[in-house]
Amino acid sequence: MATTWLVTVSLPLAFVVTTLMVTLHSSVQHEVLHGHPFANRHLNEALVFLPLGMVFPYGRFRDTHLEHHRDEHLTDPYDDPESNYLDPKVWAGLSWARRRLLRANNALLGRMLFGPALSVWRFARADAAAIRAGDRAILRDWLLHFAGLVPVVWWVWQAPMPGWAYAIAAYAGFSLLKVRTFLQHRAHDLARGRPVIVEGQGL
């Protein structure tokens, strides 16, 4: 509705609604990979097969996120695929500009502005290397992703909403997700000290 009817009323309003829907879709993907809402995995995954966020293959998100949930690996810069931490030796070898960018990414505004692009770059680079090394499972997930992109791109192509507006809304949706994950984990010597529990309600 946001990309078809609402955009004819107000592009900014349609942009906001599309952003929220992309965010909600990603949140539903997160619930699906944890086995909700149905007992049948295939039925669950059918709900989120189409990549409305356009960037990440669901299968790769599922596998890397479940790996991330292994407590002994949490925040480890080598073993946690979602870690924002770096080995001190790796950090020491980075350029000044790269360090500034990563420092900005450690602030909430920077995480929202730069975090999605940094995540996509790191994720795609690692998967490309794995595919070149012969990982057929990762290749399969990307091929399924591209197949799912076909109807999404077709829909956006024929919809009144400009393609650039949808692409920015998809990025903005990812930015909103970065708010939730910003203070989700912290560095700690013990695995049990790494998850962050936010005790409160509302915003």
Annotate the PLM regions.
Residues 1-24, 28, 51-167:
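Non-catalytic, topology-defining segments of multipass membrane proteins
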Residues 26-35, 61-73, 180-189, 203:
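Histidine-centered catalytic micro-motifs
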Residues 35-49:
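Membrane-interface motifs of alpha-helical transmembrane segments
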Residues 38-39, 62, 92, 198:
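Generic, ordered loop/turn and secondary-structure boundary motif
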Residues 39-41, 87-89, 125-128, 188-193:
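Short alpha-helical linear motifs
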Residues 43-44, 82, 108, 158, ...:
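Residues in and immediately flanking transmembrane alpha helices
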Residues 166-203:
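Extended hydrophobic/aromatic segments used for targeting, binding, or gating
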